[in-house]
Amino acid sequence: MAFDPLLCRPILHSLPSAFKVNLRTARSGHWLENSILHLVDEAGSGQAGSKAVLAKLSEVLFVDTLRRYIAKLPDREVGWLAGARDPIVGKSLTLLHSRAEHPWTMAELAKEVGLSRSALLERFSRYLSEPPMTYLIRLRLQLAARALTATGRGVVEIASDVGYESEAAFNRAFKREFGLPPARYRRKQRTEGNNS
C-alpha cells in the first residue's frame, strides 16, 4: 500500500493511537488470529519473498481492522473516517478525490449528492471541520506537492492538472499552504530527500 503522508494526513488524524481487536468476539476472529500467527511465523522465517508476504498481509490486516473500526464509530463521531462513512459526505469525498481537477462549485457538488448547498455545507463541515471547497483546495495543493516531488513536470502543467487555470493563483495558494512557492518547495524536498 503506497503511503503518502500529505494525502493520508486527514485519515491519520482520525485514527486512534492503537486498535484493540477482540479475537473472541470478532466475526472473523479465527481468520484474524491465524493471519497474525502467520505474520509472526513469516517474520522469523527469512524465506525468499517473505518481505512481500509481510507487506501484503500487513496491508490486509490493517484494512480489515480499519473497516471494523469505522463500522463501530458512534453516530455522533466526527473526523475524516466518520465523514467517509456518512453516505452524503462519503460520496462528496469520493467525487472530490476522484476528480480533484474538476472546477467544482458548491451548487454542482450539492446536486451530485442530492442535497441543497446549505445542507451539504453544514453536514460536510460538521464531520470535517471545514467546508467542501476549502477541503478541495487543500486536496489539490497536496496532490500538487506530491507531483512536484515525484515528477519532473513543470509547475504550470501540475497547476493545470490539479484544477488551477492561473499559475499566479496556484503559486499564491501553494505558498499560503506550504510556506514556499512551488519551485522552491520542489528543490527543498529533493535536497532533503538526497540528504536522507
Predicted regions and their residues:
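A hydrophobic/aromatic-rich effector-binding and dimerization subdomain
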Residues: 1-40, 69-72
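Charged/polar, solvent-exposed surface patches and flexible loops
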Residues: 13, 34, 41, 82, ...
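Short, Lys/Arg-enriched, Trp-marked, Pro/Gly-tolerant hinge/linker segments that flank
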Residues: 19-27, 43-58, 62-102, 107-113, ...
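A generic short-segment signal for beta-strand/edge and adjacent turn/coil regions
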Residues: 29-32, 60, 154, 160
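Short amphipathic alpha-helical/adjacent loop interface patches that line ligand
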Residues: 36, 58, 141
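Terminal helix-turn-helix DNA-binding modules in bacterial transcription factors
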Residues: 91-98, 103-110, 115-116, 122-171, ...
